[in-house]
Structure formats: structure tokens, C-alpha cells
Regions:
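A structural signal for short, hydrophobic/glycine-enriched beta-strand patches
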Residues: 31-244
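Bacterial N-terminal signal peptides
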Residues: 18-19
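C-terminal segment of N-terminal export signals and the immediately downstream linker at the start
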Residues: 1, 22-36
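C-terminal capping/extension of enzyme domains
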Residues: 232-272
């Protein structure tokens, strides 16, 4: 967890809405310039605006670092390929199984497991590229692992498939969360330390949260330097939020806030 997350977050909607407004209200003069303002100047202006909106300088000082991290910090911690001890690949969406008669408009009402789809194929391509440079064990979520097996003939010698979605009798599909996948990977090895230094491969917009989740489970997780992560979106994805970047980013930031909120509540009130 980043040190900036070690404060108590306000959980009221009254705090969140002005905070979002503050993000959009950062100096019009600064936005008019081609050069982005510095992180320090951004935080100064956010603090000033939040203090006006909330009329509480203490709370503004607490909330601003969270907003700056979640809204404005998307860089990834990275390591050289030579330092990688294992690869962890998280999937990103999927496509409805054509054989089941389902399509993107039918949502999760399917009679069989979905198809990996083009984005997970791109993630698998990135994993394969990395394996060529550093042949280590790959722990890949099912959608990615299925492509690695079919397209690149990877086997149990260097690939472990993790957590497929489940299809209920009524056609409802349940997808594992990043937390579930990370926990399942560690269960295979017994400890996170046994994985060594981990390179996380997934969609670029999910990578920050995927690395944070991996670290929360004890993994020494990073992005791999020199590996280009997928940035495309699939308009035919089963999940509506995964079809467009604007929708996905809102979804991802919401999940970051939810994780932060749960963590801070657990820290402050461990007994409930």
C-alpha cells in the first residue's frame, strides 16, 4: 500500500462529490497550457478547492492525496526483465460463447464458458513475448491461459491456469475478482515469497490496480520494462464496462476507492 493511503478516509457521498468536482475545477489557466502542472501544484489547487467545498482543511488534507493517487497517478512500478522470477497474467473481459447463441447484448446469460476475446489474446501475446526473454513459470487467469495453450502450445511445464469463470444453470456467469485470482496463485505456491519477483501482465488500464492487488496479497509485483501492455477495448465484450475506456476507467477508479475504503476501515476499526 502506498504511504499516502495511511489516513482515514471519509465515506460520505458529501465528501466524494465535491472531491470529484475539485478534480474538474483545477485552474482553467493550468488546463489551457500544453504543459501539465506539477504534482505539487495540482495538490495545492486541489487542497484549496476542497477546503472551500468542504469547509474543513483537515479533511481536505486527508482526502486530496487519495484523489491525486486514484485520479491522476497511473504510472507503474517496473523492473528489468532479468529480475523476474514469475509472471502473473490477469484477464480483461471476454466475449460471449458464440456456440451458446449469446452475444454482447445478452450480457452474462450464457450456457457455456465465454471465449477469451481479442484483448485477452493481446495479453497472451505480451506474456509470450516476455517468456521468450525470460522463461519463467506463468500463472495466468483462465482466459489468458487458454490462448497461451492454443496459440503458443504452452503446457503445465511453464503455465498454470487460474480461476475460470463459473456458469450457473440459469446462464449467469460469475467472474473471479483480482483478489480471488491473486489468492489462488499464492495457494498454488504456498506463500507469495515462493513466487520471487513477479511481473504482472494485463490490460494497461487495469495494471495499476492489478499490481496493487498482487502486492496486497504479499507478492513483490511490478510491470516488466520493455513489455507493451494492451490498450485496446473490445466493443463486443461481455461486460459493458470493458467495451469503452471511459466506462472502464470509472469502474477501475470506483474499485480503487472501494479497496482503499475497506483497507482504512479495517485499520481503524479491526474489530468492526
Amino acid at each position: 500500500m502506498s504511504s499516502r493511503r495511511q489516513f482515514l478516509i471519509s465515506t460520505s457521498a458529501a465528501a466524494v462529490l465535491p472531491a470529484a468536482a475539485a478534480m474538474l475545477a483545477v485552474s482553467s489557466k493550468a488546463w489551457a497550457s500544453d504543459a501539465p502542472i506539477s504534482d505539487a501544484e495540482l495538490q495545492r489547487q486541489m487542497l484549496a478547492k476542497l477546503n472551500v467545498e468542504l469547509n474543513d482543511s483537515t479533511i481536505a488534507s486527508t482526502e486530496a492525496p487519495y484523489l491525486q493517487d486514484i485520479f491522476f497517478s497511473w504510472d507503474l512500478p517496473s523492473i528489468p526483465v532479468a529480475q523476474i522470477g514469475a509472471i502473473v497474467a490477469y484477464s480483461f473481459g471476454d466475449r460471449p460463447a458464440a456456440a451458446s447463441g449469446a452475444n454482447a447484448t445478452s450480457g452474462t446469460g450464457q450456457s457455456q464458458l465465454p471465449q477469451p476475446g481479442p484483448i485477452n489474446e493481446e495479453i497472451a501475446d505480451a506474456v509470450h513475448q516476455l517468456v521468450q526473454s525470460k522463461p519463467v513459470m506463468v500463472y495466468a487467469q483462465w482466459e489468458v491461459a487458454s490462448v497461451l495453450t492454443a496459440k503458443y502450445q504452452m503446457s503445465s511445464a511453464n503455465l498454470q491456469s487460474i480461476k475460470p469463470p463459473t456458469v450457473a444453470s440459469n446462464g449467469t456467469i460469475s467472474y473471479p475478482a483480482l483478489d480471488d485470482v491473486a489468492a489462488a496463485i499464492i495457494a498454488l505456491q504456498g506463500t507469495a515469497a515462493a513466487l520471487g519477483t513477479v511481473a504482472v501482465v494485463t490490460h494497461r488500464d487495469q495494471a495499476k490496480r492489478a499490481i496493487q492487488t498482487s502486492r496486497a496479497h504479499g507478492m513483490n509485483a511490478y510491470a516488466a520494462q520493455g513489455v507493451t501492455l494492451p490498450v485496446d477495448y473490445d466493443a463486443q465484450a461481455s461486460q459493458p464496462a470493458n467495451r469503452r475506456r471511459d466506462l472502464y476507467l470509472l469502474n477501475d477508479m470506483m474499485n480503487q476507492f472501494a479497496t482503499l475504503r475497506a483497507s482504512l476501515i479495517a485499520q481503524q476499526y479491526p474489530n468492526g
